[in-house]
Amino acid sequence: MSQAEAITDTGEIESVSGPVVTATGLDAQMNDVVYVGDEGLMGEVIEIEGDVTTIQVYEETSGIGPGQPVDNTGEPLTVDLGPGMLDSIYDGVQRPLDVLEDEMGAFLDRGVDAPGIDLDTDWEFEPTVEAGDEVAAGDVVGTVDETVSIEHKVLVPPRSDGGEVVAVESGTFTVDDTVVELDTGEEIQMHQEWPVRRQRPTVDKQTPTEPLVSGQRILDGLFPIAKGGTAAIPGPFGSGKTVTQQSLAKFADADIVVYIGCGERGNEMTEVIEDFPELPDPQTGNPLMARTTLIANTSNMPVAARESCIYTGITIAEYYRDMGYDVALMADSTSRWAEAMREISSRLEEMPGEEGYPAYLAARLSEFYERAGYFENFNGTEGSISVIGAVSPPGGDFSEPVTQNTLRIVKTFWALDSDLAERRHFPAINWDESYSLYKDQLDPWFTDNVVDDWAEQRQWAVDILDEESELEEIVQLVGKDALPEDQQLTLEVARYIREAWLQQNALHDVDRYCPPEKTYAILSGIKTLHEESFEALDAGVPVEEITSIDAAPRLNRLGTTPDDEHEAEVAEIKQQITEQLRELY
């Protein structure tokens, strides 16, 4: 839809304050999209008071001033949904950056626009309905091979009244061609639009019972997230938020990944664009970009568009969820989104809340995270959206408003620790501060699909790490050698849990992804060391001899053992540990 076709009425600018513009003479409604100034800068109505309309503009506003026109479209901010979104990169209002770069180079002109999906590409449509079939909102009417990994399901729009199919075609079509006609006169295309601030409807929201397997041992082993769950990754500068997010985007067992770079550095998005096409999806072996949509709203792009990029991403995620896919959405970082809200709020001269953030910060965060979940769709399928948001508290202070409000909402908390990062322990997730409220509902899945004693093994590791934390304070006062021998041995076992199990190299070809079976196997090797060491200690063997066996250090190399060899390697190490320790008594 071009700007000219969309205009319903025109007003004029009254004042400009950064990204906030006030206009008069507009017959607008809240959240209407408007085009501001002679260049037609895209904006959104955020406040109406009498004849004065307040607009947040999604582009740099320098050069526009009072008296210039404001054109109202009469429509809310919407995204284009259809085949072609995967393997694409958008800005915060779903303008395709790769398409615009081809037209005008690395630096985009203001006021440019392009459809979110290519209207000229031909797609091979394969119908799944026949003339005479009854269809309703959300039903699948056909499929398109969108990428080598994903079959795109063409859906009856959610607002449709449905009806009987009177005509259906198979063959090659563009997204705007009619592929199905109903007896009501409604024509269904492969392309539909949806307002970003409105949640797409579903039949029911269900309790998630299956984990989103991340391939990160500390997450899958200690703090799992469910498919349809919510998680926050807060941490100070340099603690590994972005690397953790990227590892999840690369290796989580979701069908679709939506990665939102919200206010972060441009080179981080560049890294994603360079890495993802080269890396294989661990589930299918196809390129990762074949299941990924990127939304880039970096720190040097307009502040107001950060506010919309989060909603754009979650709406795209909901569309693929409606097809029955499991979607993982990474938002890096929600703090920059909150800062954008703070700036807009201050320009509007609203009453500030804590640290200058708007009073509605908690409500906006809740609206976003509550669109995650495990859902039953209208077409009988089940799909999920898992939302993982990075939080960037200034100075790593978890008591600031964005972290605290996020904590009240999410059910998984992965706290990154600068002390661990400085010790080069990555992922730098603090096991004392982190938690997952999904553990109990996910344990049956791990028991059925991985191993019977998954929960018991995890609890054993947690107990050892808790005991180590208590002993650390004593060690700092009197030294390790002053402890009883059994406590010295506990510290040694805890060291292996930290170094061999919790640490993981995101840059190593093998260690960057660890399947749950291998996660369990490595921990079982450490537990064997624990049990056999205490038996040797009970038999009178000095702790120095127990800790000097040469089989134990092999545990540290299990992470880099190829996945198809780890079972034999763990069994061999267990046998060596047992033999060497029993030789001592």
From Swiss-Prot:
Record's catalysed reaction(s): ATP + H2O + 4 H(+)(in) = ADP + phosphate + 5 H(+)(out)
Q: Which is a GO BP term held by this UniProt record?
A: proton transmembrane transport
What InterPro entries does its record include? ATP-synt_VA_C, ATP-synth_a_Xtn, ATP_synth_asu-like_sf, ATP_synth_asu_arc, ATPase_a/bsu_AS, ATPase_F1/V1/A1_a/bsu_N, ATPase_F1/V1/A1_a/bsu_N_sf, ATPase_F1/V1/A1_a/bsu_nucl-bd
The residues listed in the UniProt record as binding ATP, with positions renumbered to this chain, are G235, P236, F237, G238, S239, G240, K241, T242
Topological type in the membrane? Peripheral membrane protein
User: EC number(s) on record?
Assistant: 7.1.2.2
Q: Which UniProt keywords apply?
A: ATP synthesis, ATP-binding, Cell membrane, Hydrogen ion transport, Ion transport, Membrane, Nucleotide-binding, Translocase, Transport
- Matching Pfam families: ATP-synt_ab (PF00006), ATP-synt_ab_N (PF02874), ATP-synt_ab_Xtn (PF16886), ATP-synt_VA_C (PF22919)
Record bears the keyword Lipid metabolism: no
Transmembrane feature ranges: none
Top-level taxon of origin: Archaea
Give GO cellular component annotations, separated by semicolons. plasma membrane; proton-transporting two-sector ATPase complex, catalytic domain
Specify whether Ion transport is a keyword of the entry. Answer: yes
Per its record, what are the GO molecular function terms?
ATP binding; proton-transporting ATP synthase activity, rotational mechanism; proton-transporting ATPase activity, rotational mechanism
**What is its subcellular localisation?**
Cell membrane
The UniProt similarity line reads: Belongs to the ATPase alpha/beta chains family.
Assembly and oligomerization: Has multiple subunits with at least A(3), B(3), C, D, E, F, H, I and proteolipid K(x).
- Task of the protein: Component of the A-type ATP synthase that produces ATP from ADP in the presence of a proton gradient across the membrane. The A chain is the catalytic subunit.
Provide the protein name: A-type ATP synthase subunit A
Q: Which gene encodes it?
A: atpA
